[in-house]
Amino acid sequence: MILVTLEQTLQDDKASVLDKMVEHEQILFCHDKATGLQAIIAVHDTTMGPALGGCRMAPYKTMDLALKDVLRLSKGMTYKCAAADVDFGGGKSVIIGDPLKDKTPEKFRAFGQFIESLNGRFYTGTDMGTTLEDFVHAMKETNYIVGKPVEYGGGGDSSIPTALGVFYGIKATNQNLFGDDKVEGRKYSIQGLGKVGYKVAEHIINEGGNVIVTDINEQAIADIQKLGGSAVRVVSSEEIYSQQADVFVPCAFGGVINDDTLKVLKVRGISGSANNQLAESRHGELLREKGILYAPDYIVNGGGLIQVADELYGTNPARVLAKTENIYTSLLEVFHQAEQDHMTTATAADRMCEKRIADAKNRNSFFTQSNRPKWNFHQ
């Protein structure tokens, strides 16, 4: 089996939970006996602004696994916010329970009360296992919800800017590999035709590229074949890794760059929307040794985050698209730094983000409502 499960990844994590906890500014354990709510909110860093991160609901087998997951994800959001250059820090929340059986309106209202108790230090929204409908209930108790539908004052479908950011990531990867960023005439293997992956395939086809696709959704496959005709080839979920293509575009699962897939990959670059594509950090070095250019996922998939962050300043689609375009230049900066300093692109991306956070410390060391930073929209 090529994919590594989330539970196995968390169990294999040998780092001390206590060490991970002390990296964070604040951790809130939420328990409401009346509704059965058990949740954890982790605020990793608010140097650049209030913490921002989605809320997952999953049937974690132990509290320890839930804590490990929320600590890992909240730290990742700090880097993702820095990469997207939005004035927010990193946070995350998890609700312990089966999203198919354990949801109630009362439970999400109770969760909203815990969010409200943080007084704006943490904003959250949907993630794996939660929906917009869930947060309609939470919004009755708190104003600190983002990623709302248009009818509730939000920016709408975040997969649109996310897919656009992935497309800019592909073009930046092409620029570094081939000396030009054109999509036409090149081949892209796309894993997953969900809300984001399908739109990425559309962008590629519309600009004259060829796609090799895989997905379990037969309707999505039929639709993309109808759109692209001979520019589309369909393969199985296992075959997608061994396709001869210019760029691999993972838009489904995490952990897809691992010991098994590295043996069969036949691409020049990787740029996709899936989170945590490297099963382990050492796989970034193995990609470098194989001469495969990796566009760090948390930069590439930042378009949705940019839209969500924009909601808090008054939704402006033109501003979102302009800021999403910066993903292209950020990746070129990362690629250049990695080449210059003989390091992996993942390490170069982390260093870029750490510098942005360090620079922000000169202006703002800890977020409160009274010192909320403002975007400079003219940059």
Curated annotation (Swiss-Prot):
The keyword Zinc-finger is annotated on this UniProt entry: no
Biological process (GO), any one: L-phenylalanine biosynthetic process
Classification via CDD domains: NAD_bind_Leu_Phe_Val_DH
Record field: catalytic activity: L-phenylalanine + NAD(+) + H2O = 3-phenylpyruvate + NH4(+) + NADH + H(+)
Annotated keywords: NAD, Oxidoreductase
InterPro entries named among the record's database cross-references: Aminoacid_DH-like_N_sf, Glu/Leu/Phe/Val/Trp_DH, Glu/Leu/Phe/Val/Trp_DH_C, Glu/Leu/Phe/Val/Trp_DH_dimer, Glu/Leu/Phe/Val_DH_AS, Glu/Phe/Leu/Val/Trp_DH_bac/arc, NAD(P)-bd_dom_sf
Residues at the catalytic site: K92
Residues involved in NAD(+) binding: 56, 127, 158, 162, 192-198, 215-216, 252-253, 273-275
The protein's name in its UniProt record: Phenylalanine dehydrogenase
Gene source species: Sporosarcina ureae
